[in-house]
Structure formats: C-alpha cells, structure tokens
C-alpha cells in the first residue's frame, strides 16, 4: 500500500476521484507486473522488450480516440509481430491495479488505526468456528453463489466503490472488445476469464460477492433483535483482509420490502463462505431455513438479475449430512462417554452423548488430484514423474517433500490421519521411481544403494515440530499428533501443491 502512495499523486486524484489518467502511467504496469498473482502480464518477453511494448501501447492510446486497441486490428499482428491479445492482457492487468486504488486508500488513509487480524485471514480459522457452533445446530444448507448473468452487473457493482465514470466506461469498453459483452456468462467463460486475468477477475467477482453479503448483513441486522456488533465482509484478496463498513442502507434498502424482514428473526442463523460456496446453518425448524432459501433466491433475482432455482438448494439435517467444504468432509457425530456418579451410598452410571464436529480427508478426490498431475494412476498406484527426471536428485526430493508437507500441513485438522499415510506412500514411491528412472535403474536396486536415507526425509511437519517440543515424551507426542491442529498461516488453497 505504501508503494501506491509513493507513486501516485494522491491529493490530486483522490480529491477528484479521477483514476483513468493513470492508464497512461508506465509505473502502473510495473506495479501490475511486480505484484501480479501469476506475473503473466508480459509472459515470454524480456524486460527490454516489455518496456518497449508498454511505451508503444501508451503512445497508441494517446494518438487514438479510444483507449483500447481493437482485437480486430489487422495491422497490429502484421506490423508489430505480437499476439493480438497481448495489449488486452497488459491493459486489463494495469486497469485492475488502478481500480484497486479506492479500496487500498480506505485502508491506508483511514483515520482510525486498523488492526491487522492476520489470524482471521487463514482458511483454517473457519474450522474452530465450525467446531464451536455447528454441534449446537440442527439444519444446514449448501449454497452456491451464482454468477451474474451479464457483465454489466459486475460494472454496476463497482459504481458504488469507484466514482470515476470514465474508468467504468473504460471497463465496459474493455469487456466489450475482448470478452464478448453481448453473450451470457457461463462457467466456461468465467474459467477462461479467471485464467487469462486473475487479478481483474478477482476484483470483479469479489465486488459482486461483497455487495451480495452487504445486503445479507444489512437485512440480517434490520430483522434481528440481537444486533451484530461488528459488520463487514472479508475480501478474498489478501490486500483486502480488513472488515469494511459501508452505508448500504441508502443503496440497497429499496430493493426489498420491509414486510419480508420478520421472517428471519433467528439469532442462531450462521453463515460461512469461502470463494463461491457458502453454508447456512440454523438451530430452528426447517420452516425458517426454507424462508431463508426463498429469501436468497429473491435477493439474487431482484437485485443481481440472476435466475436461480429454489429446488437446487437443499436443506439437510446436520446429524445425517456431510459437508464438502474447503477440502474436508465435515459431519456431526455423537461422542459417547460413560460417567459413574455416586450420591451417599448409591452409585449410578450415566451415558452422556455429546456432538462433535468430525473432519475427514477426502482420500478418493485427493488421489484423483494426484493422478491428474501424474503422481499415480487412477487406482492410486504410484508412477514416476517423467517430466522431473531431468532435474537433480536434490530438486526431485525437495519437490516431493514440499508437496507432501503442504498436504500434511493443510490436513493436520483431520480427525483420522491414517488417510494421509496412503498419500505419503504414493508420493514416497513416486519419488523413488522418478529417481530410479533418472539413474536408469530398478526401484529395488536403487533402494538398496540408497538405504533408508530417503525414507527418513518423509516425516510430517507436525512430527518434526512436536518432537522438538516434547523430545522425551513419546506418549504426549503421539497424543498431540493424533489430535487436530489448525494452522493460522494458510491463506490460499490453490498453492498447496505448487511444486514450481
């Protein structure tokens, strides 16, 4: 955030809310490249030619009446020799940085001190909440947040945050030129958009989800006698991790009549979301859950113009339903305990049944993911990673170790860790087969020559840490390791098996 203040003329642009002139500044594209999610803005070009491309792009934008160079410009590829989508990629990633500035300035220039709740940024911070709340609840519903049906909906969402009309028109023009503005949004289009420009996609999608949750929170506060103390939404982007307050009453209050608010006076309604999947859970009767379901459908249809079928939102009894959320299968199971009590001369035995959140590793989907990246076949039998055979022995072992430690780190909250032993076996044997293939040897011959050194490397991170804390207490170590451990430093699921 400090880099934005150092580069930008904040007083000038913040006073008038003019953002579009920044599209002509070279440092904007440098920031987009240095702080990009995948640094793909100038992929395949060296620094010298990259700077030349940016200068040429800015020069063409100055000379033309419109900002965006048309993808149908026949002379572009013929004269310059570049891919016709390269200019689109550069402008869109630079534009994403520009539109992020109003969000960033609210955090940097806030008069009140911002407390950086790093622990709440972790994905694992959701599970202690589920452990605490869900055993007392009865009904749950898995809800997929639908995409807006037209790109104009995303642009209209940004107008509450970005006051510069020229920037919004530029965004419309960009989407019209390069992403087939007139077509409906499908999952394939969103997938292509997210891959080609993840920064702009996250900005648009998060603003859409943020607005939806602002409405949800506002109506929840209006309808409940137990007002929420803190109000706000967490952004998925790491830069926007703080809770943000915004006057949604003026913007959204007219979209829904006050008569429907009395339906939702439930102090035990809980809402959890990660990315596009959310969970609604309640302690009350299924009738209230049904009312919440139709409320959400009306919210999407009336405000976001998204068609959604109520029949596709299922309400399940929590005691008989397993949640597929954040890579875990979570369910509520009874935990029986026998207590012997004695009063005067009489003793009696009581059975106490307590509900407990059970989190399991989805072993079959996990093996499927390993098979997709060629660590094993579809049946889970390890195979060699042929694309890594040209690397050094140290690099091969280090890559396998990082993958397993990341998986072990993330699934440390599992109630039953025996499933991880199979993943450990697959990765260990795949590593041995890769090394044997590199040295043109058999697995048995290679293991005889190597000994047990390779096997010693495949310890989980939890075992290493706990062995340092409890060097002599083997029973305590085993007890701690068999329990669940939630880490507060995991911010992204997609990088768990990033082996590059």
UniProtKB/Swiss-Prot annotation:
Query: Which GO cellular component term is one of those annotated?
Result: chloroplast
The UniProt keyword set, sorted, is:
Chloroplast, mRNA processing, Plastid, RNA-binding, tRNA processing
Which GO terms label this protein's molecular function in UniProt? Answer: RNA binding
Supply the Pfam families for this chain: Intron_maturas2, MatK_N
Task: Name the InterPro entries for this protein.
Answer: Domain_X, Maturase_MatK, Maturase_MatK_N
Summarizing the function annotation, the protein's role is: Usually encoded in the trnK tRNA gene intron. Probably assists in splicing its own and other chloroplast group II introns.
The entry sums up its family as follows: Belongs to the intron maturase 2 family. MatK subfamily.
Q: Which HAMAP family match?
A: MatK (MF_01390)
What is the protein named?
A: Maturase K
Q: Which organism is it from?
A: Prunus laurocerasus
């Amino acid at each position: 955030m400090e880099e934005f203040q150092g580069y930008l003329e904040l007083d000038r642009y913040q006073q008038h809310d003019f953002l579009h002139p920044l599209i002509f500044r070279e440092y904007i594209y440098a920031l987009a490249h240095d702080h990009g999610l995948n640094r793909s803005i100038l992929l395949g070009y060296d620094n010298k030619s990259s700077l030349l491309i940016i200068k040429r792009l800015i020069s063409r934008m100055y000379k033309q009446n419109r900002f965006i160079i048309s993808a149908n410009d026949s002379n572009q590829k013929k004269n310059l020799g570049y891919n016709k989508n390269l200019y689109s990629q550069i402008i869109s990633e630079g534009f994403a940085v520009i539109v992020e500035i109003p969000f960033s300035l609210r955090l940097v220039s806030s008069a009140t001190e911002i407390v950086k709740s790093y622990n709440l940024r972790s994905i694992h911070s959701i599970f202690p909440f589920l452990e605490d709340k869900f055993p007392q609840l009865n009904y749950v519903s898995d809800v997929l947040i639908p995409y807006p049906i037209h790109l104009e909906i995303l642009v209209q969402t940004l107008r509450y945050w970005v006051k510069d009309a020229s920037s919004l028109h530029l965004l419309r023009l960009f989407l019209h030129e390069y992403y087939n503005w007139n077509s409906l949004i499908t999952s394939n289009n969103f997938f292509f958009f997210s891959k080609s420009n993840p920064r702009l996609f996250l900005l648009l999608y998060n603003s859409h989800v943020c607005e939806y949750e602002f409405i949800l929170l506002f109506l929840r506060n209006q309808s409940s006698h137990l007002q929420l103390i803190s109000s706000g939404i967490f952004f998925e982007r790491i830069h926007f991790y703080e809770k943000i307050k915004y006057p949604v009453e003026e913007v959204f209050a007219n979209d829904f009549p006050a008569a429907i608010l009395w339906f939702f006076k439930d102090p035990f309604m809980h809402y959890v979301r990660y990315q596009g999947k959310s969970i609604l859970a309640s302690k009350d009767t299924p009738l209230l859950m049904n009312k919440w379901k139709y409320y959400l459908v009306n919210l999407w249809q009336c405000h976001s113009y998204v068609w959604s079928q109520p029949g596709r939102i299922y309400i399940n009894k929590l005691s008989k339903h397993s949640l597929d959320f954040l890579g875990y299968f979570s369910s509520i199971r009874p935990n029986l305990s026998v207590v012997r009590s004695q009063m005067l001369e009489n003793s009696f035995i009581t059975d106490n049944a307590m509900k407990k959140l059970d989190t399991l590793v989805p072993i079959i989907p996990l093996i499927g993911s390993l098979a997709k990246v060629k660590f094993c076949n579809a049946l889970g039998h390890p195979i060699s990673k042929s694309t890594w055979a040209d690397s050094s022995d140290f690099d091969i072992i280090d890559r396998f170790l990082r993958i397993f430690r990341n998986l072990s780190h993330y699934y440390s909250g599992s109630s039953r860790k025996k499933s991880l032993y199979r993943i450990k076996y697959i990765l260990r044997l795949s590593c041995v087969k890769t090394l044997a293939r590199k040295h043109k040897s058999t697995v048995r011959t290679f293991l005889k020559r190597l000994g047990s050194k390779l096997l010693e490397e495949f310890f989980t991170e939890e075992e290493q840490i706990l062995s340092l804390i409890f060097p002599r207490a083997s029973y305590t170590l085993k007890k701690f390791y068999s329990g669940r451990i939630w880490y507060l430093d995991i911010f992204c699921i997609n990088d768990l098996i990033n082996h590059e």
